[in-house]
């Protein structure tokens, strides 16, 4: 089962835009419920805190996803992803993947060196050694925060159908991400109604997905740009991850009184 791994794939792409206010600060934490139909099958939390790495101040993000209830009894999943991010550049300096899915386990650390080479970055994995990649490369979580700061703040410039293609480092390899913009919609969640930006991350057809459009993602169209709902259409049915709680947001969450479209 690669549910939480897939969840990570879809919230990324880096695009530089200097001088904008950050959409988040350390102390932000978001809680999600993961449901299969009316049955809750798991929970997830995403938070970022102030920390240090090699004596320097960093922002430490942690994404935890795990099964609950009957799903946990049938197939236990506990996936933890961590990113240590430079506040100024918003680039990762350390990425950690620690997953348990049934009997399968994997632990991987990658150190990012963005400065030793002028034309590329050096990535050192504890599993596969040294890799030379393009400058400005992100890991999964740092890309998520970079997305909120440097692309979604300018969403008025996006047109329906616009496609963004980026390259990220995940599971010890370069992985292309394609994100298609679908427009703005108002949706109802467990914390209230809100205007959202809707995206289809183009997924890889195969073991999980039947088509390239089987994942849909909603970000709040306010100053926070929080991911509040993710819908997965996979071979066995539809899973939905939805926000159920939050704290430490930089800006008040903008809630609506009426639905318009979903």
Give residue spans per PLM region.
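Acidic, serine/threonine-rich low-complexity disordered tracts
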Residues: 20-114, 153-262
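Sec-dependent N-terminal signal peptides
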Residues: 4-15
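Generic alpha-helical structural signal
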Residues: 13-14, 21, 132
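Histidine- and/or cysteine-centered catalytic micro-motif in compact active-site loops
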Residues: 3-4, 204
């Amino acid at each position: 089962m690669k549910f939480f791994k897939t969840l990570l794939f879809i919230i990324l792409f880096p695009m530089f835009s200097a001088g904008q206010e950050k959409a988040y600060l350390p102390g932000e934490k978001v809680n999600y419920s993961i449901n299969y139909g009316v049955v809750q099958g798991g929970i997830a939390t995403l938070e970022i805190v102030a920390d240090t790495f090699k004596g320097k101040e960093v922002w430490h993000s942690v994404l935890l996803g795990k099964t609950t209830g009957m799903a946990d009894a049938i197939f236990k999943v506990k996936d933890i992803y961590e990113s240590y991010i430079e506040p100024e550049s918003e680039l990762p300096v350390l990425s950690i993947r620690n997953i348990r899915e049934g009997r399968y386990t994997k632990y991987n650390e990658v150190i990012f060196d963005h400065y030793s080479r002028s034309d590329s970055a050096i990535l050192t994995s504890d599993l596969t050694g040294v890799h030379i990649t393009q400058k400005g490369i992100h890991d999964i979580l740092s890309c998520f925060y970079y997305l909120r700061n440097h692309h979604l703040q300018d969403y008025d410039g996006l047109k329906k159908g616009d496609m963004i293609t980026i390259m990220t480092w995940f599971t010890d390899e370069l992985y292309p991400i394609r994100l298609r913009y679908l427009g703005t919609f108002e949706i109802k969640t467990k914390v209230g109604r809100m205007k959202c930006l809707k995206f289809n991350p183009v997924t890889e057809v195969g073991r999980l997905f039947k088509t390239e459009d089987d994942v849909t993602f909603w970000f709040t169209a306010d100053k926070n740009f929080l991911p509040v709902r993710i819908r997965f259409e996979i071979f066995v049915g539809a899973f939905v991850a939805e926000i159920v709680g939050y704290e430490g947001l930089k800006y008040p969450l903008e809630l609506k009184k009426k639905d318009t479209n979903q």
